[in-house]
């Protein structure tokens, strides 16, 4: 997980996959 939280659900899923910074 990159950001660790605070995003909307789909954004959180992408972050967990390491797609978003």
UniProtKB/Swiss-Prot annotation:
It is an enzyme of class 3 (hydrolase). The keyword Repressor does not apply. Belongs to the cutinase family. Disulfide bonds: none annotated. One of its GO terms (molecular function) is cutinase activity. On the 2D-gel the determined MW is: 40.2 kDa. Inhibited by diisopropyl fluorophosphate (DFP). It catalyses: cutin + H2O = cutin monomers. Catalyzes the hydrolysis of complex carboxylic polyesters found in the cell wall of plants. Degrades cutin, a macromolecule that forms the structure of the plant cuticle. Allows pathogenic fungi to penetrate through the cuticular barrier into the host plant during the initial stage of fungal infection. It is found in: Secreted. Its EC number is 3.1.1.74. The lineage of its organism: Eukaryota, Fungi, Dikarya, Ascomycota, Pezizomycotina. GO terms for cellular component: extracellular region. This is Cutinase 2. Induction: By contact with cutin. Keywords: Hydrolase, Secreted, Serine esterase, Virulence.
